[in-house]
A protein has these predicted regions:
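Repetitive helical segments and hydrophobic/amphipathic motifs
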Residues: 21-22, 131
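Sec-dependent signal peptide recognition
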Residues: 12-20
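N-terminal compositionally biased, intrinsically disordered segments and leader/signal-like regions
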Residues: 6-8, 17, 122
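N-terminal signal peptide c-region/cleavage motif recognized by signal peptidases
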Residues: 25-27
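Non-catalytic substrate/cofactor recognition surfaces at enzyme active-site rims
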Residues: 31-493
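N-terminal secretory signal peptides that target proteins for export/translocation
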Residues: 1-11
Length: 493
């Protein structure tokens, strides 16, 4: 048994700099697989002496109550020595620096564990953990005490999952049912979706009882809309509730390729069997129906699940420096909106420099001048009998589906109409079970194909107004930086 760890610095096209980490478990007996699960509530206390700003729809949306609790849910997988823990948290997102803080605390609590992934579901009805949704522009919405508590809570939950590990069997599921695509709305061209649903069920070897079921699907958790002021995990709440009722154990939900994919609007029409009418948009009933349907399809995917005698686990990780090309984010960084949790770098080193600049819609403001932000991508391979049987990619933001499934297009009005297309992720993957963990270990915003980037008029397809997306992206080179790093991890295998 050996673990190979390599860390180095190198230059490559589209990346400023990269650090790589490889953790390998060689093939061992199939009986060596162990799994454990744990969960904890991370809902902020209400009422409180100060406002809890809700994230996702703009400024000054203050929480008025709690509909359902927010959770950190963690699954630990171990083959021989390497232990991988994946955590899904009901938050709009966590910055990479928070994840590094969580990892340090986790290592103290579970020093033998090898690697931790923390992915946010991206609920639009949870507390602002990014700072962008405070009382007004350039005023943070982060409650530092709450966020520090959440970081510690996630670390403890991950360690609890490790302590709960027991001999386990792994079952893998996938569903391509046409309904999955109908439950996703896309307004921006090209109207490409990522409808695939992937599941992973861990069963106790001794009893046959479910330890945990992992569900991976793609749509923004924003069914309740901007008028809602109650804290909720949105439709993933009902996904998990259905799966746990049917299969037992703990359910985890991971958002996938959610860039520009929404369940809001007329594209996603859900018939309420109790009334015989369509569920109203931005309603609790629509959230319940959507989540329950995804839960049902998740259970369906496992009816003929492939039981895998897992005997190898490999984690590859790379730190990536992505150019910061968003003026609003630079102003936010300089104003303290990110409260120091998303610093800028130049040449791979922290760069706190800032200057005064005039911005069209903000006036004269402080402006951070560092070149890049630091983030991470991961590639996990699960193997059996010398063959990779399942793969996990972490995406540090909200990736447009055409970057995952293909279908990138060139339209009149694009700012970079001749830009080369980025590599398509699923074309690089080898297995039937291709898990995409969006907002994995970071939230850097939308990842948009450069050839479709449209920040200046004329707009794509001669639209009368700008398309939504660019305002919440690091810039036109972000997708290429992230996908270039991922492909470099995948291709050798």
């Amino acid at each position: 048994m050996s673990v190979y760890i390599h860390m180095g610095v190198r230059m490559r096209r589209s990346l400023t700099m990269a650090l790589s980490l490889i953790i390998v478990a060689p093939q061992v007996s199939a009986e060596a697989l162990r799994a454990g699960a744990a969960q904890s509530v991370i809902t902020p206390e209400l009422p409180t002496e100060h406002a809890v700003y809700l994230a996702g729809f703009g400024h000054n949306r203050v929480a008025s109550g709690v509909h359902d609790d927010l959770y950190a849910r963690c699954l630990a997988l171990e083959i021989a020595t390497p232990t991988l823990v994946v955590c899904s948290v009901d938050l709009i997102g966590l910055f990479y620096d928070d994840v590094l803080t969580i990892r340090r605390a986790f290592q103290q609590k579970a020093p033998a564990a090898s690697f931790l992934v923390v992915a946010s579901t991206h609920t639009h009805a949870g507390p602002d953990t990014l700072g962008l949704y405070g009382p007004k522009p350039l005023a943070t919405g982060i409650d530092g005490r709450y966020l520090d508590w959440v970081d510690g809570r996630i670390a403890s939950t991950a360690a609890d999952a490790v302590r709960a590990m027991q001999p386990a069997l792994l079952k893998l599921g996938r569903d391509d049912h046409p309904l999955l695509e109908l439950l996703q709305g896309v307004d921006r061209p090209p109207r490409v979706k990522d409808p695939f649903l992937f599941t992973m069920r861990l069963v106790a070897r001794s009893t046959g009882e479910t330890i945990a079921t992992l569900v991976n699907w793609s749509a923004h958790p924003e069914v309740l809309g901007r008028k809602n002021t109650q804290i909720t995990s949105d439709y993933p709440h009902w996904v998990r509730a259905y799966v746990e009722k049917q299969l037992g154990g703990m359910a985890l939900f991971f958002s996938g390729s959610i860039g520009k994919v929404s369940p809001l609007g007329d594209q996603v029409a859900l018939l309420d069997p109790e009334t015989g009418k369509l569920a109203e948009d931005e309603s609790w009933r629509k959230a319940e129906l959507l989540g329950t349907e995804i839960g049902r399809l998740a259970q369906r995917s496992l009816q003929n699940a492939e039981q895998v005698n897992l005997n190898s686990l490999t984690v590859q990780s790379e730190i990536v420096f992505v150019p910061m090309q968003n003026s609003h984010f630079r102003a936010a960084a300089a104003a303290g909106v990110f409260v120091g949790r998303k610093p800028l770098y130049s040449g791979g080193k922290l760069d706190p420099a800032k200057e005064k600049r005039d911005l069209p819609d903000l006036g004269r403001v402080e402006y951070a001048t560092g070149h890049d932000i630091q983030t991470e991508v991961d590639y996990v391979r699960l193997g059996a009998a010398g063959t990779t049987v399942a793969e996990i990619l972490t995406i540090p933001g909200e990736i447009y589906p055409e970057l995952v499934n293909g279908g990138m297009a060139r339209y009149p009005g694009a700012d970079y109409p001749e830009a080369p297309f980025e590599p398509v992720l699923r074309e690089q993957l080898k297995t039937t079970y291709q898990f995409i963990f969006g907002l994995g270990n970071d939230e850097i915003g939308y990842l948009i194909p450069k050839a479709e980037w449209d920040e200046q008029p004329p707009w794509l397809m001669n639209a009368a107004q700008s398309w939504y997306g660019e305002i919440n992206s690091l810039g036109p080179d972000a997708a290429g930086s992230v996908l270039g790093a991922l492909v470099s991890l995948i291709r050798p295998y």
